[in-house]
Amino acid sequence: MTLRLSAIDLRHSNGTLALRGLDLSIERGERVAIIGPSGAGKTTLLNLLASALPPSAGQLEVLGVNPWQLSSRQRQQLRSRIALIHQAPPLPARQRVVTAVSAGKLGQWGLGKSLLNLLHPLDVPGARAVLARLDLADKLFERCQQLSGGQLQRVGIARALYQAPELLLADEPVSAMDPRLADHTLALLCQHAIEHNVTLVASLHAVELALAHFPRIIGVRDGRIHFDLPAGEVERQHLDTLYANEQLSPQQVCEVAETVWAPRC
C-alpha cells in the first residue's frame, strides 16, 4: 500500500476547511488522476500526500508510515522518496537547466555533494538523458529564464524523473503545454510509472486527458471525494454534477464521457 487516508480533514491556517472526511487507498504502481473544479482541494490533497502539509484530523499513511509521527530528519528522508511536480516549477531564473534537473537528487545526497553540484553538475549525462525523453536535450545549459512556460514544466518533470521516486505526484503538470505536447508528456509519465512500478497521482483540469491516460479517476469537489471510479465507468452524469456551475459545457462533457474513456497506458 502506497497511500492510505482515513477520515482526513485539513484546515488551512486562515480557517478554511480544504479537505473533509477523505477516505482513500492507493496501491503501489497505480496510476490515478484527480479531477474537479478550481478550488476543489486537488492541490491541497497532493501537498498532503507529499507530506508538505499535515492533516488536521484523521489518519495518514504514506509509503507505509505516518509522516507526522516521524522526526524531522526521518520525514526529510521520506520526502526523498517522493517527487512533486508543480504546475509552475519553482526554478531560479538564472539557474541552468542541467543544475535544475540534477536538483532532483539533492534529498538523497549529502550537503557536500549537493553544494558541489551547484558549482559543477555531477551527472551531466544523466540529466541529458532524462531531458532527451522530453525533447529538451538541446536546452541542457540554457538558463531557466530563457524557457517558455511549457518548457519549464517539462524541466520540472525531468527533475522528478531524475530523482527516481517511489511516489510521483503531479499538480497540473501539462497546463502550459499545447494539446499534442500535453498528450505526449502524460503518455511518457504513465510509461515511466509502468516501467518502474511507480505510483503516479496527477491532478488535471483537462478531463479528456485524465480519462485517456489514467485507469482510475477520482473526482473531488468542495474538499470531498465526489466519485472514485475506473476511467471506463465515468459517465456524463458524474461529470455534470462534479462540474456543476463550472465552465464546462454539456457538449464537452458528453464528448468526453462517450468518446474518451479507455486508458492508453
UniProtKB/Swiss-Prot annotation:
Topology with respect to the bilayer: Peripheral membrane protein
UniProt keyword list: ATP-binding, Cell inner membrane, Cell membrane, Membrane, Nucleotide-binding, Phosphonate transport, Translocase, Transport
Segments forming a coiled coil: none
InterPro entries from the UniProt entry: AAA+_ATPase, ABC_transporter-like_ATP-bd, ABC_transporter-like_CS, MetN_ABC_transporter-like, P-loop_NTPase
GO molecular function: ABC-type phosphonate transporter activity; ATP binding; ATP hydrolysis activity
Major place of residence: membrane
Statement: the UniProt record of this protein carries the keyword Repeat: no
Protein EC: 7.3.2.2
PROSITE patterns: ABC_TRANSPORTER_1, ABC_TRANSPORTER_2, PHNC
Tree of life domain: Bacteria
ABC transporter domain location: 3-247
Annotated ATP binding sites: G36, P37, S38, G39, A40, G41, K42, T43
Subunit structure: The complex is composed of two ATP-binding proteins (PhnC), two transmembrane proteins (PhnE) and a solute-binding protein (PhnD).
PANTHER family: AMINO ACID IMPORT ATP-BINDING PROTEIN (PTHR43166), PHOSPHONATES IMPORT ATP-BINDING PROTEIN PHNC (PTHR43166:SF6)
Name by which UniProt lists this protein: Phosphonates import ATP-binding protein PhnC 1
Taxonomic source organism: Pseudomonas syringae pv. tomato (strain ATCC BAA-871 / DC3000)
